[in-house]
Amino acid sequence: RKYMFGRTNKDIIQYAISKEPTPEMVKELADEKEALYRDMCKKDGENCKLAPFAEEFLDYLKNNNIPRTIATMSEKDNVDFYIEHFKLERWFDLDKIVYSDGKIKGKPAPDIYQIAATNLGLTTNDCVVVEDAESGIESARAAGIGKIVAIASMEPIEFYKKIPAVSQIITDFHDFESIISKDLVRVN
């Protein structure tokens, strides 16, 4: 997972084949991988849904005019799929979403969160990031994000407790007011 989540398709393919892939190989394999992924999501609505209480959390952010965006290493086709599938335009300014365009360094580089903060007109220290991937947490730390919240969706809570940059660990968005609080929550 460490070498797969939050990474560019080029990085994932390079890891999988243990050598530098050609641009043609990256395009072909990435297109096939992403099409399969979207197809799986369409067929498995039970498992392809927003995290529990995410809609309430996003409604709260929107209703309170709290700046928000998405910073993902997914490529444009997947971002468009997510926007349509989850109706994300209800909560996000689509022009401010940051995604892998082939120019942004993949996580754990800080670039994606620096760009997201700039798009929102904020400093990275003024931002809260909710992240599930270890590479994304490292990316947020490297960017100087003020508060990093780990959502334990792919790994057990104990995994995130070992990561010093994590300020808070959640399993869903139920307690969303604590998530956006700049008060740091002690991680035991």
Label every model-predicted segment.
Residues D59, E75-D77, F81-N188:
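Asp-based, Mg2+/Mn2+-dependent phosphohydrolase catalytic module
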Residues R1-E55, D59-N64, D77-D80:
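N-terminal helical cap/lid subdomain that shapes the substrate entry/recognition surface
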Residues M4-R7, E24, G45-P52, M73, ...:
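Residues at secondary-structure transition points
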